[in-house]
Curated annotation (Swiss-Prot):
PROSITE patterns: CHAP (PS50911), SH3B (PS51781). This is Autolysin. Gene3D superfamilies: endopeptidase domain like (from Nostoc punctiforme), Peptidoglycan recognition protein-like, SH3 Domains. This protein is probably encoded by a prophage (AC Q8SDS7). It catalyses: Hydrolyzes the link between N-acetylmuramoyl residues and L-amino acid residues in certain cell-wall glycopeptides. It comes from the Bacteria. Residues 7-142 form the Peptidase C51 domain. The keyword Nucleotide-binding does not apply. It comes from Staphylococcus aureus. Residues 398-466 form the SH3b domain. Keywords: Cell wall biogenesis/degradation, Competence, Hydrolase, Secreted, Sporulation. Autolysins are involved in some important biological processes such as cell separation, cell-wall turnover, competence for genetic transformation, formation of the flagella and sporulation. Autolysin strictly depends on the presence of choline-containing cell walls for activity. It is found in: Secreted. The keyword Cytoplasm does not apply.
Length: 481
């Protein structure tokens, strides 16, 4: 049977489903299986069989329709493939989704009900985009003539063969294991920070605003012998990248990581490194190592993972930190849009808590990103470039977006981002510019753009003068898109 849509037509159809809910069989609400069936029905006018998503490769006759492929380490999924997750997902029922992008390390999918709970009426878990690290328990299914493949998450034992009516009993496969953390305790020597007199009450998770080279080892090399004057600019307890944890302070010591007396004294600060320079996959791995270290410490101190013990830097002071995690897991960028709203803050905290609890329970969680984040789109781009500082004291970084002015004129400057620079013209309400650079200077956030061969500098909000990532920004004078 020929599919009713081409691959490109089907991908476009999937994109139109985002934000909607599907209950094809009218049972148990909006399940992942319903979303797979919605796509299958569009393609063939048929419904898939199976008690749970994990049964799809076994309970259906795909002759002339599709081919089941082993998701081996060198297998590269294609857009339009269907991915089937095994029984270690979905409380034993598995999971199913449609692939729209893939590498050998991860897949980006359209899916429904990844978080569970879709059986309850009113649950707001519509179809959306998610990112999944490649797992050892998936299958892929490819449609004949369309390359929609049902991919079983990578099984490294006997190759699965759809033609076997009674597949061989699978040998037990090793369960995924957490990475082995390399914990280096080398306490800073330039100043002996005071003791708190008790265990920490919890952990504050930071993003370091560091470049690609700002690894845990790099921080160690730069800070372990740093003088007091440097440590006063900020020192956390631990720095994490890859599988390396540099412990810069003893657990009993106060840190200088929140610009707040309570946060510094009672909470252990951990920096997720490379938050400005690393690609998304690298940063997500750094996050996972951080969650694993958080789990180890909380268990050591006899503390649970909850909203009281897992804290964010922006709970203690007005800051964009943790900026990269905010973008990836809530879709909100506090660097360009201002302080993280309370609902987004709780969303981010709860994601952290869920990941940490999994490690505390001996499980290996799957990193996910918000469908509002650029990391979940088909054209993944870095969340932010590294802030740099020039000889004039201007912080700047590359960023391409459109600013649309609000209801008041703004004075545009030439030459540079200073209020003392020559006036260019009055940027009128409702006007817009496509900028390529963001700057912090002279009490304002500026964007730089070129119009008719002239470079212009436009202030778009106030800035308190604090260096990134601790800058405090005023309300935006328009909109960024």
């Amino acid at each position: 049977m020929q599919a009713k849509l081409t691959k490109n037509e089907f991908i476009e159809r999937l994109k139109t489903s985002e934000g909607k809910q599907f209950n094809v069989d009218l049972w148990y609400g909006f399940q992942c299986f319903d979303y797979a069936n919605a796509g299958w029905k569009v393609l063939f006018g048929l419904l898939l069989k199976g008690l749970g998503a994990k049964d799809i490769p076994f309970a259906n006759n795909f002759d002339g329709l599709a081919t089941v492929y082993q998701n081996t380490p060198d297998f590269l999924a294609q857009p339009g493939d269907m991915v089937v997750f095994g029984s270690n997902y979905g409380a034993g029922y598995g999971h199913v989704a449609w692939v729209i992008e893939a590498t050998l390390d991860y897949i980006i999918v359209y899916e429904q009900n990844w978080l569970g709970g879709g059986w309850t009426d009113g649950i707001e878990q519509p179809a959306g985009v998610g990112k999944k690290l490649q797992d050892d328990n998936m299958l892929m299914i490819s449609l004949c003539g369309l390359s929609v493949r049902i991919l079983k998450v990578r099984q490294r034992h006997d190759q699965f063969n759809l033609l076997h009516k009674h597949p061989k009993k699978e040998t037990a496969k090793p369960q995924p294991k957490a990475v082995e953390l390399k914990i280096i305790k080398d306490v800073v020597k330039g100043y002996d920070l005071p003791k708190r007199g008790s265990n920490p009450k919890g952990i504050v998770i930071h993003n370091d605003a560091g470049s690609k080279g700002a690894t845990a080892e790099a921080y160690r090399n730069g800070l372990v012998n740093a003088p007091l004057s440097r440590l006063e600019a900020g020192i956390a307890h631990s720095y994490v990248s890859g599988n390396t944890v540099w412990q810069a302070l003893d657990e009993s010591q106060v840190g200088w990581h929140t610009a707040n007396q309570i946060g510094n004294k009672y909470y252990y600060g951990i920096e997720v490194c490379q938050s400005m320079g690393a690609d998304n996959a690298t940063f997500l791995k750094n996050e996972q190592a951080t969650f694993q270290e958080c789990a180890r410490l909380l268990k050591k101190w006899g503390l649970p993972a909850n909203r009281n013990t897992i804290r964010l830097h922006n709970e203690f002071t007005s800051t964009s930190c943790p900026h990269r995690s905010s973008v990836l897991h809530t879709g909100f960028d506090p660097v360009t849009r201002g302080l993280l709203p309370e609902d987004k803050r709780l969303q981010l905290k709860d994601y952290f808590i869920k990941q940490i609890r999994a490690y505390m329970d001996g499980k290996i969680p799957v990193a996910t990103v918000s469908n509002e984040s650029s990391a979940s789109s088909n054209t993944v781009k870095p969340v932010a470039s590294a802030w740099k500082r020039n000889k004039y004291g201007t912080y700047y970084m590359e960023e391409s977006a459109r600013f649309t002015n609000g209801n008041q004129p703004i004075t545009v400057r030439k030459v540079g981002p200073f209020l003392s620079c020559p006036v260019g013209y009055q940027f009128q309400p409702g006007g817009y510019c496509d900028y390529t650079e963001v700057m912090l200077q002279d009490g304002h956030v500026w964007v730089g753009y070129t119009w008719e061969g002239q470079r212009y500098y436009l202030p778009i909000r106030t800035w308190n003068g604090s260096a990134p990532p601790n800058q405090i920004l005023g309300d935006l004078w328009g909109e960024i898109s």
